[in-house]
Amino acid sequence: MTDEQHAENNPAQSDGPTSAGFVALIGAPNAGKSTLMNAMVGYKVSIVTPKVQTTRSRVRGIAMHGNTQIIFVDTPGIFTPKRRLDRAMVSAAWQGAEDGDVLLLLHDCARKKIDEDTLAIIETLKKSGARASLVLNKTDLTLPEHYLARTKELSELYDFEKIFMISAESGEGVDDVRDWLAEQMPQSPYLFDPEDLSDLPMRLMAAEIMREKLFLNLHQELPYQMTVECESWEEREDGSAEIKLVIFVAREGHRGIVLGKGGQTIKRIGQAARRELEEIFERRIHLISFVKHKKDWMDDKDRYRDWDLDFNA
């Protein structure tokens, strides 16, 4: 990210009191939480794919708005969990909601009707007594009469503190949300360095970008059956970096699919990941990828700890 881009998305600070706080983004899978956070921060800090349940752990993006620091917490989508990993992801989402100074419920208003996951989230909010604001996302994909009717329908289910209509993809309405959020943040010293954009370590970012490309290039349930780890990160004298990533698959048969004939599939995916990593880190990247079979990777306690997930959720 260039200095000019950083300045554009983080208005200049001035002398005086500072504010800082957390904004928790919750919603059904694929509501657009990661896209919104990236738009708010002005930088890609969370991976985005058309597939549901892409985000596995809580990711924090940091935006400066004058003398206010807004820390966005992108939580996994909330849905009915079936596996251990699902339960841990949903638990992390609700924990993120509890930790926020402001809670934003994102809803994909382009859907034909309110989805069951969103209805379940609203019922949980009612029981907890939590205050939440509604963000109807993807207004660019539907007609005004549709999302206005959806607004009325959702308002009858829950007394939202504030309602916004946006397109996180195009940026329409995003500034209004950011301005309002800045007003809600409590007076406080900054919680992160004002130059920081995320608390995500570079090694984890590299693994996440590779995982995003796997989701975009592999079909059906296969991407959900794999994970990516950064095995090593080596700085080179010429200023470039050598990154070794390991892709773990749950079934031996999946290994061949990921590799492709003559290794062409993983080569194509790796090239896409390398190009994006070079753009993010603004340096040359040497990316080396391995594909390994590890049947029980979903039951590895250490991996859950790395993702900031509760293994026993």
What are these regions (language model features)?
Residues 55, 79-80, 112-113, 142-143, ...:
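Catalytic P-loop NTPase motifs of RecA-like helicase/translocase cores
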Residues 74, 137, 167:
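Active-site glycine-centered loops adjacent to acidic/histidine catalytic or metal-binding residues
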Residues 2-91, 95-97, 107:
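Conserved G1/Walker A P-loop phosphate-binding module
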Residues 43, 62-66, 96, 100-103, ...:
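Conserved, well-folded catalytic cores of nucleic-acid-processing
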Residues 64, 69, 91-163, 234-237:
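Conserved C-terminal guanine-recognition region of P-loop GTPase G domains, centered on the G4
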Residues 202-313:
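P-loop NTP-binding site
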Residues 32, 173, 265:
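Conserved glycine(s) of the Walker
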Residues 130-131, 140-198:
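Canonical P-loop GTPase G-domain recognition
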